[in-house]
Regions:
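Boundary at the C-terminal end of the N-terminal hydrophobic targeting segment
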Residues: 11-13
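Extended, loop-rich substrate-binding clefts of extracytoplasmic carbohydrate-active enzymes
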Residues: 83-159
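Extracellular structured ligand-interaction cores
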Residues: 27-29, 59-61, 125-129, 146, ...
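Residue-level recognition of well-ordered beta-strand positions that form the cores
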Residues: 37, 131-133, 146-150, 165-169, ...
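Beta-strand-rich N-terminal accessory domains
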Residues: 15-86, 165, 174
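Bacterial N-terminal signal peptides
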Residues: 1-8
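Acidic (Asp/Glu-rich), glycine- and aromatic
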Residues: 42-45, 53-55, 155-191
Length: 191
């Protein structure tokens, strides 16, 4: 088990207002709002009904929005390197039961949100705790992940602090995580 991976991120902005809230758009995404403006959107939908929809939803990630709450400043589905999405976690060289898996480029399996263990918000910040399973090619879980994303406001010149941590637990066999710095761990991909 990897106890924690932590990735703090400070987002520049003009408004350090208070008043966080969380709103779930069931089976699609969860929004974190600050004074009525979207600051983050956790994209957790999983839909394997068509190849295109599966490609769009094969891993959960956190979008970060501009100071007006209108547009993501992080990359989403599509464009060049479609696997680069917001704030996400993965490895391109995973060994499990004698086979190699890629949960970076997402070939031969997915990372699937199972449920929220906790969502909360108050005047100081918001927190999302998500349980995910990292599947093999047969949709059998290899890894159980508890992903925690904490969002709070900070002093100027920044607007937000985002802490991303993950607890990973091997299921059924040992797991070896490997990859180069560009294809392993927690990453932030701007739009």
């Amino acid at each position: 088990m990897i106890p924690h991976l932590l990735c703090p991120l400070l987002i520049n902005g003009q408004n350090a207002a208070t008043g966080f809230s969380v709103e779930d758009r069931t089976n699609e995404y969860l929004e974190v709002m600050l004074d009525g403006r979207i600051v983050c959107r956790y994209m957790y939908a999983y839909d394997n009904s068509t190849p295109d929809r599966l490609h769009e939803t094969y891993k959960p990630y956190l979008h970060v929005f501009d100071a007006d709450g209108e547009r993501p400043i992080t990359k989403g589905f599509g464009g060049h390197f479609t696997h680069h999405r917001g704030i996400f976690i993965g490895w391109n060289k995973i060994q499990f039961k004698g086979k190699s898996y890629d949960r970076w480029h997402m070939t031969g399996g997915e990372i699937v949100h199972q449920k929220f263990l906790d969502t909360r918000a108050n005047s100081d910040g918001a927190e999302i705790v998500s349980l995910t399973h990292w599947h093999d090619e047969n949709q059998v879980p290899m890894i159980e992940e508890i992903r925690t994303m904490s969002i709070s406001h900070v002093s100027q010149p920044f607007r937000l602090r985002i802490d991303f941590s993950a607890q990973l637990k091997a299921l059924g066999s040992d797991v070896f995580l490997d990859g180069d710095p560009e294809h392993a761990g927690v990453q932030y991909r701007p739009a």
